[in-house]
Structures are given as structure tokens and as C-alpha cells.
Amino acid sequence: MSRTVQLVVIPGDGIGPEVIAEAVKALDAVTAGSGLAFQKTYFSLGADRYLATGDVLTDDDLAAIRGHDAILLGAVGGRPGDPRLAGANVERGLLLRLRFSLDHYVNLRPTTLFPGIASPLAAPGEVDFVVVREGTEGQYVGNGGAIRPGTPHEVANEVSVNTAYGVERVVRYAFEQAGQRRKKLTLVHKTNVLTFAGSLWKRIVDALAAEHPEVAVDYLHVDAATIFLVTDPARFDVIVTDNLFGDILTDLAAAISGGIGLAASGNINPVGEFPSMFEPVHGSAPDIAGEQRADPTAAILSVALLLRHLGERPLAERVERAVTTDLAARSGQMATASQTRTTSQIGDAIAALAAQN
């Protein structure tokens, strides 16, 4: 049965357009002849748009995006120190507004150490886990302020907001992920100090654990979790945590598995009320924009997350196998200057592999 998905594509700034072109190339290759088609609508959003119009994300933009099924995003951010962007806060005005307006309450970050990819760890073992980070609460809701700013008596605060409703829905999603994987879930928090929020998270995890007896559940303080991420990452299957802790842990997870250049993420509305968004974790790297030096692998892995979210697991696995094969070939070459490929050449290779699988 044929199916058409309405896809928003936001190339963004810097290397964003280059890597997203290769992601779309891989998407088209893997879906050719499958009965799954993507109707793509491109949106010019980001620092360049702001410099041209003074707008980051208008209400009309948001309304148009809401009418689609999913979003594929490249990277957002202008050149650091550009005085024309002073005070614009493009990343917050675009990315956080999309996440909150579209109720992306799950931030999903898979972590895999692919064969042939070097890790800074001496003996990492098998690294294959996902972090399910709450995406719309915690310290990121903007509940804070300052009095007497700029004086020796300044007081500033950021309130972490945790609701039973918000925690329960992200924990349910994490249990579902664990049930589809190796059936282990680890709650990471700081219950010994953050007693109110920590207690809420712990009680909800314990309550839902009774509904999922097949899933083994454990708990780690966030400081202990950082230790185990570098001493025994193979112990993890699904980590569930709040917005701030998840933000920190996921970058550490990327660092032990090849770097953020290989890290993809999903900002997900699991119930499908709004379009979910998929993007590479890396930034816009304006210093190399237009030079065809950016690695599009993370953007292509974002396509795999998109396909998996849409229920197209076989197609997602084809993309993942293509990436695995390409990465193994790269490590075998020990790329010299003459062997280094351009952004589009990497995309061509992965797309060809995805089409064959």
C-alpha cells in the first residue's frame, strides 16, 4: 500500500544545507520503489533568515509546519561573534520554540559505537544504548529571573518544573523502548539532593515498573552515571532522565562513541498530535560551510530515526546497515588526504548502499 508523508525540511545555516542534502539523498534512495513517498516542503529558517528578514520563527511558519507529518533539520546558528546576531538567540527562538510548541516531550538520543570507529575509552565493550530525555520541562521552561542584576547583590534563579503528567508520559515511552530492546531501564537523577523532583521521578518509575515486569529497572545518581558511562557503558540499555541531566549525559555519550559528528537525535511527539523533528546533534560549523568538508553521517542517521518513528523499521535498518558498512570502509582506509571524501561523496556512497540493501 502506498503512503505519502508530508515532510518539512529545514536545511538551516552553515553546513546544514550540505548535510541535509545528503540526508534527503539517502531518504530518496532507501524509499525508492517501497510505496513510501515523501512530499517535501522546504523552510528557510535560521540565522540567515533572521539576518534577511528580522524573523526567527513566525506564527505563520509555525502554523504551516504543524500541518506536516515530520521535520528534518540540518543545523542552526550563525557565525560566532557576528554583531548582527547580538541578542537574537536564534537557537532558542527556533529550536526551543519548535520543541515546546510541538510538544516534543521526548528527546531520543541513540548511542552506538560502530565497528571500526575509535573511542577514547581503552576498553569500551559493546556500546549500544539510548537516552530518553524529557524535553519540555525541567530548567528549560524559562521559569526564572534575576533581581538587582549587575550589582554585587544580584540574585538569579532557574526553577526546575517537573509535573506528574510530564514525567509519566516520558517514562512510559522509555519503558516501551526498553521492551523493544534488551529490557533494561535505568533512571538517572539526583534523588539524594533534589528530593522533591527526584522523589516524583522515582515514584513514577517504580509504579510503571509494575506494569512492565519483563523490564529490569535500576537507578543511578547522575554523578555515578557519568562514571559508568566511561568505565562500563555496556551496562546501559535505556536511560531515562530529566531535561538538564539528559542534555549533559547525551553529549558525554556521543563523546565515547565517535563524537557528535555521528550523533543523531529525535525530538518526538509520540502520540502524533504534532510533527516530530529529527536532526544531527552537531552545530552549523560556519567556518567550513560551503567547503564540502562536513560529514553527513549524523544527518543520514537522523533519517533512520525518522523512518523508525514512522513505523518503517526495515527501511530504517537499511539506512543503519549502509552507514555501518560505510564507516567500516572508512576505518579500513585510515583516510589519508588523498582518500578523504567530500560531503556529497559520502552521501553518494551511503545512498548507494541503502538502495542495495
Swiss-Prot record:
Subcellular location: Cytoplasm
Listed Pfam families: Iso_dh
Binding annotation for NAD(+): 283-295
Marked site: Important for catalysis: 140, 190
Amino-acid positions noted as binding Mg(2+) in the UniProt annotation, renumbered to this chain: 223, 247, 251
Residues annotated for substrate binding in this entry: 99, 109, 133, 223
PROSITE patterns per record: IDH_IMDH (PS00470)
EC number: 1.1.1.85
Required cofactor names: Mg(2+); Mn(2+)
Keywords assigned: Amino-acid biosynthesis, Branched-chain amino acid biosynthesis, Cytoplasm, Leucine biosynthesis, Magnesium, Manganese, Metal-binding, NAD, Oxidoreductase
GO molecular function list: 3-isopropylmalate dehydrogenase activity; magnesium ion binding; NAD binding
Pathway noted in the entry: Amino-acid biosynthesis; L-leucine biosynthesis; L-leucine from 3-methyl-2-oxobutanoate: step 3/4
Parts forming coiled coils: none
Family: Belongs to the isocitrate and isopropylmalate dehydrogenases family. LeuB type 2 subfamily.
Subunit structure comment from the entry: Homodimer.
HAMAP family cross-referenced by the UniProt entry: LeuB_type2
Function: Catalyzes the oxidation of 3-carboxy-2-hydroxy-4-methylpentanoate (3-isopropylmalate) to 3-carboxy-4-methyl-2-oxopentanoate. The product decarboxylates to 4-methyl-2 oxopentanoate.
Protein name: 3-isopropylmalate dehydrogenase
The organism's taxonomic lineage, starting at the top: Bacteria, Bacillati, Actinomycetota, Actinomycetes, Micrococcales
Gene field: leuB
